UniProtKB/Swiss-Prot annotation:
Function: With S4 and S5 plays an important role in translational accuracy. Located at the interface of the 30S and 50S subunits.
Name of this chain's protein: Small ribosomal subunit protein uS12c
Top-level taxon in the UniProt lineage: Eukaryota
SUPFAM superfamilies: Nucleic acid-binding proteins
Organism of provenance: Euglena longa
Entry GO CC: plastid; small ribosomal subunit
Keywords linked to the UniProt accession: Plastid, Ribonucleoprotein, Ribosomal protein, RNA-binding, rRNA-binding
Listed HAMAP family: Ribosomal_uS12_B (MF_00403_B)
Subunit structure: Part of the 30S ribosomal subunit.
GO terms for MF: rRNA binding; structural constituent of ribosome
Keyword Lyase: no
Record InterPro entries: NA-bd_OB-fold (IPR012340), Ribosomal_uS12 (IPR006032), Ribosomal_uS12_bac (IPR005679)
Amino acid sequence: MSTIQQLVRKRRKKIKKKKKLAALDSCPQKKCICLKVHTITPKKPNSALRKVTRVKIISISKMFTTAYIPGIGHNLQEHSMVLIRGGRVKDLPGVKYKVIRGCLDAAGVKNRKNGRSKYGVKRPK
């Protein structure tokens, strides 16, 4: 506990709240350019090769982040334009964003019947 004299000399510091999704900058989505498309392995109990992409956010020139590519198969490559949204992947440390499928250069998932809206698939006729 500080004394009154100590508080007169130096005020208490305000604790700044850290943003969970700094790259989105209070926006629902951001447009990005793919720099590298690769796979990474998940944390301990799980085992797989998860598809991720290293992206550069267009509006924030020096901001780079990693985004997860959901669904089976993708057509993304270097210099593809993608739209990212928030939403972390629990077993991939440091991955806090997801690519929106069916938008810009990211094609929708083929032969998808359920949960189509998250994978950019139109309603079957």
